[in-house]
From Swiss-Prot:
<comment type="similarity">
    <text>Belongs to the peptidase S14 family.</text>
</comment>
<dbReference type="InterPro" id="IPR029045">
    <property type="entry name" value="ClpP/crotonase-like_dom_sf"/>
</dbReference>
<dbReference type="GO" id="GO:0005737">
    <property type="term" value="C:cytoplasm"/>
</dbReference>
<dbReference type="GO" id="GO:0009368">
    <property type="term" value="C:endopeptidase Clp complex"/>
</dbReference>
<protein>
    <recommendedName>
        <fullName>ATP-dependent Clp protease proteolytic subunit</fullName>
        <ecNumber>3.4.21.92</ecNumber>
    </recommendedName>
</protein>
<dbReference type="GO" id="GO:0004252">
    <property type="term" value="F:serine-type endopeptidase activity"/>
</dbReference>
<keyword id="KW-0645">Protease</keyword>
<keyword id="KW-0963">Cytoplasm</keyword>
<feature type="active site">
    <location>
        <position position="131"/>
    </location>
</feature>
<comment type="subunit">
    <text>Fourteen ClpP subunits assemble into 2 heptameric rings which stack back to back to give a disk-like structure with a central cavity, resembling the structure of eukaryotic proteasomes.</text>
</comment>
<dbReference type="GO" id="GO:0004176">
    <property type="term" value="F:ATP-dependent peptidase activity"/>
</dbReference>
<feature type="active site" description="Nucleophile">
    <location>
        <position position="106"/>
    </location>
</feature>
<dbReference type="InterPro" id="IPR001907">
    <property type="entry name" value="ClpP"/>
</dbReference>
<dbReference type="Pfam" id="PF00574">
    <property type="entry name" value="CLP_protease"/>
</dbReference>
<comment type="function">
    <text>Cleaves peptides in various proteins in a process that requires ATP hydrolysis. Has a chymotrypsin-like activity. Plays a major role in the degradation of misfolded proteins.</text>
</comment>
<dbReference type="GO" id="GO:0006515">
    <property type="term" value="P:protein quality control for misfolded or incompletely synthesized proteins"/>
</dbReference>
<dbReference type="GO" id="GO:0051117">
    <property type="term" value="F:ATPase binding"/>
</dbReference>
């Protein structure tokens, strides 16, 4: 999350730490990054994806054996940006534990399901929504046809991954993602997007 985006969320609290060498202040997100916590808040786009990918790679370099916590409150966004995050989550050595706090829709829900099996969580009043890939091509008919073929290929790719991550049959995933498919936290658990609904830390 960039400084400009965090400013848009309102006043960002600062945390002051004292040590033998004096005081140091962090914005709250940087302090939580030290605890291996990453946030995806708002739309998935190239900028947010680059920041999340950079944080994942940094935390892997700090300790490749310790889990990373990825908190998601996102309506979704760009497929290509989201796939950059997804591929990095699978690429790095540490397990990435995902947690939905609020809303995970579209690419947000896809990334929620992308967490390490057994380590995907949702808070009890969160909502999750899956649907098919969106696209908007303009221009010459031939160009639109090329884009349509690519969107259909991407749709099949994402359905296949979601079926694999959730354990649902591919035909069910295809049918459910034809339109917006909303779920409560418990329904998302039954679907296989998350492994556990938690109200308090264990």
């Amino acid at each position: 999350m960039s400084a400009l985006e965090t400013q848009a969320l309102g006043m960002i609290p600062m945390v002051i730490e004292q040590s033998g060498r004096g005081e140091r202040s962090y914005d709250i997100y940087s302090r939580l990054l030290k605890e291996r916590v990453i946030f995806l808040v708002g739309e998935v786009n190239d900028q947010t994806a680059n920041l999340v990918v950079a944080q994942l790679l940094f935390l892997e370099s700090e300790n490749p054996d310790k889990d990373i916590s990825f908190y998601i409150n996102s309506p979704g966004g760009s497929v290509t940006a989201g796939m950059a995050i997804y591929d990095t989550m699978q690429f790095i050595k540490p397990d990435v534990s995902t947690l939905c706090c609020g809303f995970a829709a579209s690419m947000g829900a896809f990334l929620l399901a992308a967490g390490a099996k057994g380590k995907r969580y949702s808070l009890p009043n969160s909502k999750i929504m899956i649907h098919q890939v969106l696209g908007g091509a303009r221009g010459q008919a031939t160009d639109i046809e090329i884009h349509a073929r690519d969107i259909l290929r991407t749709k099949d790719q994402m359905n296949r991954i979601l079926a694999e991550r959730t354990g649902q049959p591919i035909e069910k995933v295809k049918a459910d993602t034809e339109r917006d498919y909303f779920m409560t936290a418990d329904e998302a658990k039954d679907y296989g997007i998350v492994d556990q609904v938690i109200a308090k830390r264990p």
